[in-house]
């Protein structure tokens, strides 16, 4: 019998996103809300654990996954804009996409499940992952100058964006199966490892051309953090299969926050955490404290 699965996906992402990708979810482009299995239900729809009580104990010994996404990287855009000529209509269409994100963006993530600390049993699951994220943005002004030149807009926004962070995510997932529906939640503790990035609220750079010449100015505020703590929450619901149809919905990181610099205080037991060459950040030979920025 041919089955039809209809999924409704509602996802709210914070700084950190879904984890535990496998080959199946990559092939399905993330449409996993009603068909994820076992440990891989975590991060997509925790309610699915409730309908898997008959399955045996599942234990993940090792694995990792990584990915790169952006607002230009796709087979469609590469095929559409590859060639020896880029017409004005093509430029306008492409530039609208860049404007929505404020530039050309690249987001990279790396997920490493902590060995032997990921398992499911019945309607419960415990997961632990080391997650490393980075986000880089080429300024919109640079793209505008490459596509159109600077004749029509003498002042260009050249603000660069960059952030990198690492954290450990520990999650406890449980689901309550009812007669025809299952609801589930994932409670997550987020252990911040490090953070460094350009503050987008106070940083800026521009390039100006006029009759007198070409000049520019800029100001960047770099923030850093080592050690932090926070919490996250995923919630989901899914129905049992009925005449080949399954419906599901989930909120991933419905609540999610990390407060940085929670483990940097100097006490009588010893010095604060240091990573040579990385943390604490130095500027013109001076070491910055955990609450300072440049």
Show the residue positions of the predicted features:
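N-terminal, post-signal peptide beta-strand-biased segments of exported outer-membrane/organellar beta-barrel
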Residues: 15-132, 136
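Sec-dependent N-terminal signal peptides
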Residues: 4-13
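Outer-membrane beta-barrel porins/channels
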Residues: 18-23, 124-294
